[in-house]
């Protein structure tokens, strides 16, 4: 009986350590939400769920401009004629209020930039690069004796964690990037035109 209890205790301890390791990884390494649900839209607002249920855009769509509205955690995609094609719910930097000024401040930039890069082999599924910092950003940071930072992307989930899906929306978790689900970055990666404009509003 004692052996059975000992084995059960050891098994329980292993499970506890595994769960604890996952918790630490999410909290420290990726900044992802601490509590995740398998249900893709569980616990999200009606607005977020509605946006997530939108159909895929036609394969011949062209996205010429993106507008991120930080206050409501949404990103609008417009075609070459200025028509709204789709709105995506997003997560932002872990310290999202205000314009990004320095490396490591956790803020998502504000202002007008372009999509200047794309990476199909990102550590976060795929990504589209945002042209932050611009000259004004670099000049301001340098005047303070600091780096403006950079490497701002629109990206999906950390590789191997795509199943998190829309649950990432429960919390702003990036280091300044704009996060969407893997399916959404697949769509954006395919349809956003090179050098497309991106405007990021407060």
Show the residue positions of the predicted features.
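Exported/periplasmic cell-wall-interacting domains
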Residues: 5-9, 117-202
């Amino acid at each position: 009986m004692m052996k059975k209890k000992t084995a059960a205790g050891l098994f329980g301890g292993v499970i506890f350590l595994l769960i604890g390791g996952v918790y630490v990884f999410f909290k420290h390494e990726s900044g992802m939400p601490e509590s995740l649900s398998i249900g893709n839209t569980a616990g999200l607002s009606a607005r977020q769920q509605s946006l997530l249920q939108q159909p895929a855009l036609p394969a011949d769509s062209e996205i010429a401009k993106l507008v991120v509205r930080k206050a409501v955690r949404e990103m609008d995609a417009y075609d070459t004629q200025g028509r709204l094609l789709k709105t995506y719910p997003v997560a932002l930097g872990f310290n999202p209020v205000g314009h990004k000024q320095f490396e490591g401040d956790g803020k998502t930039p504000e202002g007008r930039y372009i999509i200047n890069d794309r990476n199909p082999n990102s550590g976060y599924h795929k990504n589209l690069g945002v042209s932050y910092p611009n000259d004004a950003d670099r000049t301001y940071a340098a005047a303070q004796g600091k780096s403006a930072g950079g490497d701002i992307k629109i990206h999906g989930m950390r590789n191997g964690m795509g199943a998190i899906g829309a649950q990432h929306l429960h919390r702003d978790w990036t280091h300044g990037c704009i996060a969407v689900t893997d399916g959404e970055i697949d769509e954006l990666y395919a349809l956003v035109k090179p050098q497309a404009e991106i405007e990021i509003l407060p």
